[in-house]
Amino acid sequence: MQTIATPSLPLGQRLAAFSHLCKPRVNSLIVFTAMIGMCLATPDFPPLLRFGVASLGIALVSFAAAALNCLVERTVDAKMARTSWRATARGDISPLETVTLATALGAAGLWLLHGFINDLTMWLTLATFVGYTVIYTLILKPATPMNIVIGGASGAMPPLLGWTAMTGQVSAEPLVLFLIIFLWTPPHFWALACYRRDDYACSGLPMLPVTHGIAFTCQHILWYTLMLAAASLIPVSLGMSGGFYLIAIGLLDLVFLGYAIALCRRYSDALARRTFRYSILYLTLLFAALFADRLIVL
């Protein structure tokens, strides 16, 4: 496999390749949940400059983590149809370039958080970075089919980071937001792994549908979706949200549970794909409903 950057790659394509390394679609949801965490942490809308700087700092570190993930997994990515197009897998961008990009982005993000937000948010963001790039990507993902259950903690951190960026402290409310994403992550990724199981089998990664089968995985999707539905009601009990959120999350949970039950009863790859796509919509609308409910109160 080629590992040296291709000199003849046009500038526009190289810039696009660098952009894709940062996984902008995935990170857009990460930054969105962090922003909602900021909005929920303050009685009114957070100060615009602080909001923007904190969002940028968290985004830059997230981009750095994504780039290093692509570098570490370039050999695995090259074996999978879903990821073989990535620049690191194709050899269009060298490891040195990837490390340079990740270092610059990560350092800039941490500098912003340290200099203009607070040290707690900087350290928590750094811990999230290490959790994703080292604990999840290097250690857990190739070692256990429960990788996403344990490693999902890093992906659940953004709303907590947003909260501490505004308040400088950790409280029960952001921990609830953390719990929601933590429980959302396994059914989200397992649905993807189900309909991409042949890809993962080729990669050698011990994903749950490959190691334990579809039926076992779908049962776990249902269990985690049930726990997620319960956790999604906690914001109401804590007074973080009211009637609008309760109605919205009730409908969202019913649909998600419907997908999970359907997977257990009559699995198909098409249904797993729809479940995966809905899970993204679910989390987006859940956090949007939390924000909308706050606007109604204001």
UniProtKB/Swiss-Prot annotation:
Something else known: Carbon 2 of the heme B porphyrin ring is defined according to the Fischer nomenclature.
Protein name, entry field: Protoheme IX farnesyltransferase
Membrane topology type: Multi-pass membrane protein
Enzyme Commission numbers on file: 2.5.1.141
Family: Belongs to the UbiA prenyltransferase family. Protoheme IX farnesyltransferase subfamily.
Protein's job: Converts heme B (protoheme IX) to heme O by substitution of the vinyl group on carbon 2 of heme B porphyrin ring with a hydroxyethyl farnesyl side group.
Molecular function as annotated in GO: protoheme IX farnesyltransferase activity
Provenance organism: Dechloromonas aromatica (strain RCB)
Cell inner membrane in keyword set: yes
Pathway(s) the chain acts in: Porphyrin-containing compound metabolism; heme O biosynthesis; heme O from protoheme: step 1/1
Catalytic activity reported: heme b + (2E,6E)-farnesyl diphosphate + H2O = Fe(II)-heme o + diphosphate
NCBIfam families: cyoE_ctaB, PRK04375.1-2
Keyword Cell membrane: yes
One example of a Gene Ontology biological process annotation: heme O biosynthetic process
Pfam family, one: UbiA
Transmembrane segments: 29-49, 51-71, 97-117, 120-140, 148-168, 175-195, 221-241, 243-263, 278-298
Cited InterPro entries: Protohaem_IX_farnesylTrfase, UbiA_prenyltransferase, UbiA_sf
Subcellular location: Cell inner membrane
Gene3D superfamilies: UbiA prenyltransferase
Keywords: Cell inner membrane, Cell membrane, Heme biosynthesis, Membrane, Transferase, Transmembrane, Transmembrane helix
Gene Ontology cellular component annotations, sorted alphabetically: plasma membrane
